[in-house]
């Protein structure tokens, strides 16, 4: 009898735990509520500033391939701006746009993120420079997401967007530029995604900048991660 009660109790806890985890991590409404609480804490503690960079593991269809090819769990990134009392992420999705920070966080895997900042941000990111960064960004607003990761301004992808904004507004290059051939293209998931995008003509000499190249830059310091 005791054994039966124990098993039933354990089963109940397992079901409850599963339902709680599903609500916490998979229910869109609850994910957004959590993200709003997180953003409020960040704002109240003044932990984020204009020009900060934010990284996450995206839930997009290409995220896994990016992670495997670049050997990093971070597959998406954006640039944080404050407008009035609200924070936004300027990002390259479809199309390039600004997204409320809470919605951006809620969209990522488990609501996890890392915020980074230039080590000398106080000297570099003056009001004039931030205005220039926004002006550079406005040139990309509304452009299509670049599925083939070409180094042109016709279309744009996430890490390319923030790299070019910083470089053109401040002269600072955050992250080492690489070629497509520098990545690990051997995994089957990566091969399949490359086949979808390029067919048999993979542009291995194409210049690229990955989220992890920016993430690992020695010019940045970590401000917050959850």
Q: How should each PLM-predicted stretch be described?
A:
Residues 2-226:
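Cysteine-nucleophile amide-bond enzymes
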């Amino acid at each position: 009898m005791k054994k039966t009660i124990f098993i039933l109790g354990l089963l109940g806890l397992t079901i409850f735990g599963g339902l709680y985890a599903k609500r916490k991590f998979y229910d869109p409404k609850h994910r957004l509520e959590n993200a709003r609480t997180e953003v409020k804490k960040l704002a109240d503690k003044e932990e984020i500033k204009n020009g900060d960079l934010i990284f996450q593991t995206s839930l997009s269809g290409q995220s896994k391939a990016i992670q495997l090819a670049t050997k990093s769990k971070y597959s998406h990134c954006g640039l944080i701006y404050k407008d009035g009392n609200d924070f936004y992420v300027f990002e390259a999705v479809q199309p390039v746009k600004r997204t409320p920070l809470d919605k951006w966080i809620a969209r990522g895997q488990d609501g996890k993120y890392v915020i980074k900042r230039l080590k000398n941000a106080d000297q570099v990111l003056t009001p004039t420079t931030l205005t220039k960064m926004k002006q550079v960004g406005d040139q990309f607003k509304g452009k299509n997401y670049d599925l083939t990761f070409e180094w042109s301004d016709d279309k744009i992808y996430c890490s390319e967007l923030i790299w070019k904004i910083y470089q053109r507004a401040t002269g600072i290059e955050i992250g080492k530029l690489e070629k497509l051939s520098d990545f690990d293209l051997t995994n089957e998931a990566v091969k399949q995604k490359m086949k979808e995008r390029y067919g048999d003509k993979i542009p291995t000499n194409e210049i690229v900048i990955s989220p992890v190249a920016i993430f690992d830059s020695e010019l940045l310091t970590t401000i917050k991660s959850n």
